[in-house]
Amino acid sequence: MKSTFHEKDSRATTILERIHTDVCGPFSVASTTKNRYYVIFVNDFSRKCWILFMQKKSKTFSNFCEFKALVEKESRKQVKALRSDNGGEFISGEFKYFCSAEGIQRELIAPHNPQQNGVAERKNRMIVSAARVMLHFRAFPYTCGLRHATLRFMCKTVVLIEYFT
């Protein structure tokens, strides 16, 4: 039985104090670069988000490493906490070791309680909904789906990073 969740988390007081993350996909139609997934990283303080497209969920760890290097270089601050679900891509030994070595506190949400990671879940819902609307009205080809929806609707608060590997 699903438990109820009432506790409200305090919001971060500085950038990179807490990052929310989630993987979305697979999508039935791949992008022009064969990507069927994306991983989203949301800064709890500013709500700015970064989206990295990927062909396989197994790229989540390497994408996190690249994201971390990018934001820490830009901000000159360290990622302090990472909130994610208990998906296999986030609980691998490699991921645990990296976070431990870098001093990143892991906040793994309870199974079957996505509301505990509501920040990332809401961003995912907004992006996917925008893509569906644009596809419905034929605003762009199916293969451009999420990438174009993200660019059009969230360009002020989203940073897209698409790797052509």
Model-predicted regions and their roles:
Residues M1-T165:
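Anionic group-binding determinants
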